Amino acid sequence: MPLLKRLVRLIAIAIFAPVIFLLGCQSKLIYYPNPYRVEHETLLREAKGTRVRFTTSQGAQTAFYIPPRAAANGLPQTIWLCFCGNGSLALDWLHSTDGWDERFAYLLVDYPSYGDCAGKPTPGRIRESGKAAFAALTQHLGATPQELQPRTAVLGHSLGCAAALMAANDLDVRHVVLLSPFTTMTDMGRLVLGWPLCHLNLHRFDNHKTLRQVASHAGASIVIFHGAEDEVIPPRMGRELAAAHPQVVTFHEVPGAHHNDILALISGRIGSAMTAVAGTALQ
């Protein structure tokens, strides 16, 4: 009997230890927040950017507004809300923006715990930050949401695709560019952990669902780029998302591109797609 009890105990430990581990440290497997460095301040200053401060349930948050390089009267013709990957920071977008349309303005949004932002990230809190950042931008520009909404587009990479789609859905944004999107976080868990551990996922980002909602908006125009050699999020996920909405979504698989180098490799193509997607706002 003692031997049987020991065996049962060992089996229970073998079953529940991974479960407890995954539930306890799941956020650390998904999010990789970092503080800003001196070089980021230099990038912000060179771009003539300003901080846009706001508060959410997670405390004080900071996004960054980058004005158009081209002089313009009144509000910018297009404002891109940009959401980075889970290991990047909002100001990292500034390595690319100089090569894109000079009429574009940008609101670079960090997640809770990233950069200068307090709190801890979850899908709901990231969604809250996107909405609150947009509201803060309207005040910063002295505009109304109704004035900014038709001028707004979203751009996301990796995890930022989920954030961008949530913002697009919440703000009724029709112009979307996504780089290396996943289908759902549970699908990603299946790749990394297998079944059934993938269903322990507490951070249930669902790009299938959100993309379907955004694609249903009249006039929606969505472009997806995905590296053919992406070693983190397989390109079949990007293809699957696009295939569900062929009338609205254009898919580009990029030969030779990996997960973290796609932005640098095809920055020019991305910029051209952004100009095309936002064409109605730029006319």
Q: What is the meaning of each model-derived region?
A:
Residues 143-158:
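Alpha/beta-hydrolase fold nucleophile elbow
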Residues 161-214:
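Hydrolase active-site cap/lid region
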Residues 155-166, 232:
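Glycine-rich nucleophile elbow surrounding the catalytic serine of serine-hydrolase chemistry
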Residues 214-219, 223-230:
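Short beta-strand/loop motif that positions the catalytic acidic residue
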Residues 236-283:
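C-terminal catalytic histidine-bearing segment of alpha/beta-hydrolase fold enzymes
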